[in-house]
């Protein structure tokens, strides 16, 4: 998920409808996002495609199978996160992600909650600064050996920090 304040400001109007989608489809949310990951795969280090065509049923965890969650896909289309959605029940699904950020959010099971908490902090109007997906590096080592933590949402009021982990 993005770290740029400008990007969040550009997407603020999308956060509540996205969270509403989550609430309406929360029972199947993990499968829905897993489906989005499987139908838009990327090799390690590669960027997932913007335009997607795939099977209606994909491989799930531990040999399971996940069917397209049609209602959730239509809800993503209704809020403008997907374009050109075409579902052939039992056979195939195709669509185009609106942009790189919505693609990232629809492929990350926790992004909806992080965005909602970020917006809640903004709406509270008591913080001087708010950032999501803040990365804290605890040493001088770069690369795989470095010690880092990702903080889902970090807000400050004066010199007092608030660290929020979304689960």
Where are these regions (language model features)?
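Intrinsically disordered, low-complexity Ser/Thr/Pro/Gly-rich regulatory segments
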Residues: 1-167
